[in-house]
Amino acid sequence: MSVHIGAEKGQIADTVLLPGDPLRAKFIAETYLENVECYNEVRGMYGFTGTYKGKKISVQGTGMGVPSISIYVNELIQSYDVQNLIRVGSCGAIRKDVKVRDVILAMTSSTDSQMNRVAFGSVDFAPCADFELLKNAYDAAKDKGVPVTVGSVFTADQFYNDDSQIEKLAKYGVLGVEMETTALYTLAAKHGRKALSILTVSDHVLTGEETTAEERQTTFHDMIEVALHSVSQ
């Protein structure tokens, strides 16, 4: 056991999907996996292990933001030796060439969080995705006809924030805004693990367009299918 995860050694797979919402973790496990076992209920942050096409896969909720996902990623790596960590979440698009309902594969992530400044001082460490996971996910999306864009995202430290930097970020090629990817990629790099962030565009910051609850469920399905297909090869 670790401080925030109640699993025994061997209960968690080498590959873990990481939704922010613990109820979404439960939904993924019950909808897409077979032979499901719940290994964690600590603080209501559910974790499950099952199989997908015969491969052992786990799903662990992380909560929202850099501090919360950092807790779970650190413990999954250090206490359970997880090798592959894939965030499956949502983001807001900030470029007009990225559409609501698209899937973004985050190749890199910048941030206004102080996480990397604490570790590196004046050096701007640029964390990135694992290329093999990224390529597998891209190929899976293309095979399934899922609209997908690959590029940079911005990990914000606050959900309710002013948009003064959005235009500049978009000009520099940033595709969308979310709250966890930088932490995931930085910790994966620190510990020599593989990580990828797969994001559904749920709304558009510039246009105000939003998906309905039904549409979010459909595009969420596309994202999970891409994630599972990419790690089952």
From Swiss-Prot:
Give the E.C. number(s): 2.4.2.1
Question: Matching PROSITE patterns, A to Z?
Answer: PNP_UDP_1
Q: Which residues form a coiled coil?
A: none
UniProt-recorded Gene Ontology molecular function terms? purine-nucleoside phosphorylase activity
- Site annotation Important for catalytic activity: residues: R216
Q: Does the keyword Transferase apply?
A: yes
Keywords tagged on the record: Glycosyltransferase, Transferase
* Reactions this protein catalyses: a purine D-ribonucleoside + phosphate = a purine nucleobase + alpha-D-ribose 1-phosphate; a purine 2'-deoxy-D-ribonucleoside + phosphate = a purine nucleobase + 2-deoxy-alpha-D-ribose 1-phosphate
In which residues is phosphate bound?
Answer: G20, R24, R43, R87, V88, G89, S90
Instruction: Kindly list the biological process annotations in GO that this record carries.
Output: purine nucleoside catabolic process
Q: Cross-referenced CDD domains, in alphabetical order? A: PNP_EcPNPI-like
Annotated InterPro entries: DeoD-type (IPR004402), Nucleoside_phosphorylase_CS (IPR018016), Nucleoside_phosphorylase_d (IPR000845), Nucleoside_phosphorylase_sf (IPR035994)
One GO cellular component this record assigns the protein to is: cytosol
- Catalytic residues in the record: D203
Q: Binding positions for a purine D-ribonucleoside?
A: H4, E178, M179, E180, S202, D203
Q: Which family does it belong to?
A: Belongs to the PNP/UDP phosphorylase family.
Q: How does it assemble?
A: Homohexamer; trimer of homodimers.
Q: What name has this protein been given in UniProt?
A: Purine nucleoside phosphorylase DeoD-type
- Provide the species name: Bacillus subtilis (strain 168)
- The gene coding this protein: deoD
